[in-house]
């Protein structure tokens, strides 16, 4: 910050001491548009974070699936010697989730960034620029109010130097012009930005739905194929509500093993 900017900041900080209610400038139309903008900014920022989180979570899910598949594969590898019904299911399951990760998830990464993340990010980048413009308006508003207060005091209590009032009035006129120009620009352009939000986000929303659909349908399609390698009897028991009882019987058998009580 320059020395001149520093002095202005100090003067603005003390403005509330010398600026009275009569000097303050109110613009309800701007206040309404600013509130609408802040609502848009909050939604846009949250959408950007959530969109990135969605892609990160997809990666996390598929990575976990691959890890689980590798563990299950190793478990069923041990059962091959006993000619288990599930001798090959671990292999098919691992192959399926790895193909899903490589052929689907990694392939949607680029399109998702291009059609969802990047456009949402570009829109959100404007928020910092608009925030700076609103901040600048607030500073110019304080400058304008200070000039109004200065003229008011000189009118109420004339100075010995007769030239002070004309100088103050000139400063007031310049401050008002600067403030009005920026204030009017924001009042005109903030509604335009807000109106653009739907047509801007629409293509990204459509792309998001299509990518989600592909992720879900291809994931379901691949995993559904694994069912043919599962024991048909177990599927029927699950459908008829009998599988829980079978699992309870197995747990009872495990508890009956002497090895489970060795640590007691």
Swiss-Prot record:
SMART domains: BAR (SM00721). GO terms for cellular component: actin cortical patch; actin cytoskeleton; mating projection tip; medial cortex; membrane raft; Rvs161p-Rvs167p complex. Pfam families: BAR. Its main location: cytoplasm. Keywords: Cytoplasm, Cytoskeleton, Endocytosis, Virulence. Residues 15-239 form the BAR domain. Disruption phenotype: Leads to defects in actin polarization, endocytosis, bud morphogenesis, as well as increased sensitivity to calcofluor white and Congo red. Also shows a strong defect of hyphal morphogenesis and attenuated virulence. The keyword Cell inner membrane does not apply. Induction: Expression is induced in absence of HOG1 under non-stressed conditions. One of its GO terms (biological process) is regulation of endocytosis. The keyword Magnesium does not apply. It comes from the Eukaryota. GO terms for molecular function: cytoskeletal protein binding; lipid binding. It is found in: Cytoplasm, Cytoskeleton. PANTHER family: BRIDGING INTEGRATOR 3. Component of a cytoskeletal structure that is required for the formation of endocytic vesicles at the plasma membrane level. Plays an important role in virulence. This is Regulator of cytoskeleton and endocytosis RVS161. It comes from Candida albicans (strain SC5314 / ATCC MYA-2876) (Yeast).
């Amino acid at each position: 910050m320059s020395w001149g900017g520093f002095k202005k900041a100090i003067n603005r900080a003390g403005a509330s001491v010398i600026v009275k209610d009569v000097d303050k400038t109110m613009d309800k139309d701007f206040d309404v548009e600013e509130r609408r903008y802040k609502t848009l900014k909050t939604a846009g920022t949250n959408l950007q974070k959530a969109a990135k989180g969605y892609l990160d979570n997809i990666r996390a899910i598929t990575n976990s699936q691959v890890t689980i598949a590798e563990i299950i594969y190793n478990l069923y590898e041990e059962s091959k010697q006993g000619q288990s019904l599930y001798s090959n299911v671990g292999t098919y399951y691992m192959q399926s989730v790895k193909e899903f990760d490589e052929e689907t998830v990694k392939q949607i990464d680029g399109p998702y960034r291009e059609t969802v993340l990047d456009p949402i990010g570009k829109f959100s980048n404007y928020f910092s620029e608009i925030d700076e413009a609103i901040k600048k308006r607030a500073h110019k508003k304080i400058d304008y109010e200070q000039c109004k207060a200065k003229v008011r005091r000189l009118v109420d209590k004339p100075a010995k130097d007769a030239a002070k009032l004309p100088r103050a009035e000139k400063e007031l006129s310049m401050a008002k012009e600067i403030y009005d120009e920026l204030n009017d620009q924001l009042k005109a352009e903030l509604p335009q930005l807000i109106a653009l939000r739907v047509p801007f986000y629409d293509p990204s929303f459509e792309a998001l739905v299509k990518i989600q659909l592909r992720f879900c349908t291809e994931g379901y399609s691949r995993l559904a194929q694994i069912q043919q390698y599962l024991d048909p009897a177990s599927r029927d028991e699950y459908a008829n509500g009998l599988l829980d009882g079978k699992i309870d019987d197995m747990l009872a058998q495990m508890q009956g093993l002497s090895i489970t009580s060795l640590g007691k």
